[in-house]
Amino acid sequence: MTTTMSTLPVVLVDEILARVPITSLRSLRSTCKKWEASSKTNLVGGKATARKSSHVGFILIGDKICSMKLDLNGGDDFVDTSVNQVSAFDGFAISQLFHCDGLLFCISNNHYSNYTLMVCNMYLGETRLIQNRSLFESYQNFCSYAFGYDSSKNRNHKILRNNSVSGGYEIYSLKSDSWKDLNVDLEKSIHLWRLGSVSLKGNAYFRVIKVIEEGVWEYNLLCFDFTRESFGKLLSLPFESLGDEGEGIMVISCVRDDHLAVLYQRDTLGIWISTEIEPNKVSWREFLQVDLATLDGFPDVFIAGRFIVDEEKQVVVVFGQETELDLNHGNAFIFGRDGYFTSFTVGDAPPEDFTSYVPSLVSLQIDKTGKRKARDD
């Protein structure tokens, strides 16, 4: 009896699918109906992401997007990485990455194009180029962005950005394919951090700085609710950040789209994970504290950037930011309990950005009535 792809055991198909790069999924889906159905169950339904020590995402090296798979195996061979440049983004120089609900939102640093924003579903092979309101506004990559969705049945995905022309905020709806101004504002003492917002359960969370007095400020967290299209209250952080400008590094990340994590680097490097989080309320638990000065062989100059929390292995993966005295090249560091740390290389230079990624069936197509097609899940 001849074995064909359609007659392979389900267990073997699932194992094959778990090893397929994100960017190859579209070609694989056309192999046979069984494989397409299995890919939806395996990748979208959660079998692949249920492997808690396997982390899939996209990393920005220079202005090029690369897919990355990171397996934390334990033992001597603790880290297994796979980094591959994504050819689909050739010619679209990227400056920022965002992920929400299986969609990847990219911002180009091509200031002379009227299309500097792109949303794509790598699993479905769909892409949406978003037109700016005017050519001048293509400079919006210097502004703060956020990506999320409202609580409607079919999840209308939206993009928030501050408007450098008017000084206010505007929002783009993927469903209507249009921009509109928002009647929202923040206190003059509150400033959104331009980079690094994350999406969690449809809402966006920003790092913000609140100015206490001249030269003195503190970090806070701020949620933008895409259903209400408004900001929430300032959310407290689990550490004391009051100080002079330039003191302390704060970064936020998501833990499997279930919780928010915050990193704070000052004399030590600390990680906390939310136990409860809503637009106007948050509580925290400590995950890890690392005294960098006690780590033998750790570089003298290190500024923490994006990070990944692995609760099963009780470790955190931290990508460094590039500095004038950068000696880390493209290294990332893994920190664990009892002073454990190791490093691995992800490229020739420190990554500019990173976002985790979970495939989904969210379509970017618009039907003849001008509405987005319903979710197929």
Curated annotation (Swiss-Prot):
Residues 2-48 form the F-box domain. Pfam families: F-box, FBA_1. This is F-box protein At1g11810. The lineage of its organism: Eukaryota, Viridiplantae, Streptophyta, Embryophyta, Tracheophyta.
